[in-house]
């Protein structure tokens, strides 16, 4: 093969990435129109479409390269020269970091995830020190309260690109000021100014204004979820100003934002200040660059594994019937491998399990299903695997292992954020913490169901608790769409003996679910049962689930809030939330700073 071929291949890959990201931005740019037109089904379709774009364009490039090389095999030296040529194209390229991930994806598709070495791939960035702070145009605009906070906020809201009328802008400004006063106090607020991102962040049925509350000694998040009323008018639903609240909004269990980001690396750096607890991978994930997030996630893993003296161990909790789960004690992720054989009661296949994980990737996760990264041919050093875990892997997933002497290769696994299994959490807490956990658990089931997801296996062990106390579902092998389930009420027994029989006295078909039976395992614990019955008794009735199904089949898309209901302005300020009401903060207008 000629020397010029390496450059042609490198240019072809980069042009393929340009095409992919151009389509990514095109789909993203439609978010405003979808929001304004309340086309919520189009929102869901666009989310799936944008996820599929990446693999589609990788496939197109792979076919081009096979034509260019006429299907001939390539030697190691040739591949190294291709990477060198590609690297030389990147110093002036604005999205170099994601272009590196795209190169990796093309390589993996061409060579079936074999020979994944730093020499052939961008395992590490070619430009780790390249800053994103020098930009052709600012990512955000500063607003100062020289004429008071009412005027400042009026300017912020008026500058938004949304073309709908406001339901009551003066009322919402009053709410925001009252919320800021409660959070900071008037004196501190008077020393602050706002920095607001130029682009809105769209997700579900909200357009999020994302900003920074800049104080003399610190910077806080400033997040406003803007909603559209049924009458087509805009209103602000709440104001969030803590790092914990912002972390939940940008959480790993939520769908990706639609935010127009020609320079995603710069946006990630800008967000980092208000999301200090988020890793680089999580920030790229939040803005929809999920494939590059996978690259960053792997880099974070390598950074940890090369500096720790820990061994992989089986993850705490009840051992699963489908997945073998392991972790590093100090690492915040778990590794999940599909077993070779499932427990007899699990009538699913490995292909079905993988399809379920893909469904979760593409579906609206409503803050209640953990996102995952999928890896092939994942290499582990044997000396970093506890003997008990290694024996378990060989026994339960031996068909997915390749022994390389001092290392093993796992042909397929998922990496997911680690949480405390809910069953362990419930054993450890009491009082209000127990009540909160039971409430969260029921709310998770409700919100999943409203999003057309039936969890299937709702045992506590299949849910986890995040560091913010939220309950998240993470066992996907039995999930299905709500519309595929036949919810039934158990018919009354024909004779007294029926209730004592080992077999049911009624017919059961595939897809039948009897919510009354949930009580047997959800309410068996005397500490938990009364709380569940108090807060979530309707989940034990078939008619509750059938009513939800009817709403879904009629096209209803439920509102999803990334904050508690009590934080909504309509709840906090109650009677003052009428559309025609002008709300005045308790202490009047915030005074201007000197």
Swiss-Prot record:
It is found in: Cytoplasm. The active site is at residue 371. The keyword Transmembrane does not apply. Keywords: ATP-binding, Cytoplasm, Glyoxylate bypass, Hydrolase, Kinase, Nucleotide-binding, Protein phosphatase, Serine/threonine-protein kinase, Transferase, Tricarboxylic acid cycle. Pfam families: AceK_kinase (PF06315), AceK_regulatory (PF20423). InterPro entries: AceK_kinase, AceK_regulatory, Isocitrate_DH_AceK. GO terms for molecular function: [isocitrate dehydrogenase (NADP+)] kinase activity; AMP binding; ATP binding; phosphoprotein phosphatase activity; protein serine/threonine kinase activity. ATP binds at residues 315-321, 336. GO terms for cellular component: cytoplasm. Belongs to the AceK family. This is Isocitrate dehydrogenase kinase/phosphatase. The gene is aceK.
